[in-house]
Amino acid sequence: MRVEAKYSKEPYNEAVKKNSSSIKLLEYNGNNVPKDMNTFYDLYWNDKGFYARFLSFHNGQIKFCPKETEILENGKTFKLWAISEVCEIFISHAELEFYREFEFAPDGRFLDIAIENRVGERKTDFNWVSNLEYKSKIYDEHWEGFVFIPWTAFGGKAPNLGDIWHGNFYRILTRDEKELYLAWNPVYKINFHQPQYFGEILFV
């Protein structure tokens, strides 16, 4: 699968939103989801970095971090995926075995991780810092997130027009105390760390 990340000097203005082409997530196995679980991502980029906007629909059931959960000095919330609903972005700008994982919660918490994932072994660097910026807002029927990730998180160099990176886009949510897993490109089992299923991100 392929998605276009569109060049925009002002990626969050209303004109850009109207002209965006959204990614829609499915169940991790490729099945469709109910309307109140719909999740959409819009992707943009410019000379400063990579931008994402996502809409996550809900039916009033949103899993939040316990209030006492610590936010670390670098701004991260450790093991965010296990204690909160999250939208996730996995991106590889080089070899598929090396990628970045970004997690975003409805309450504005985040987690960024550098990963080396070779056959039979996965190394995870929780101390890595991407210097991302994130804000979120919760509405009656959906919550919305805005993300900026500078190019320094991907080696420091912006892509050229026509370049192709690889990645996948996910959401973990809870309904009636059951965890559900959504993906843009299906991964066929409950394990998002399968770079062989990353789709193409084309910079246009």
Regions found by a protein language model. Name each.
Residues M1-V204:
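Structural preference for beta-rich elements and adjacent junctions enriched in aromatics
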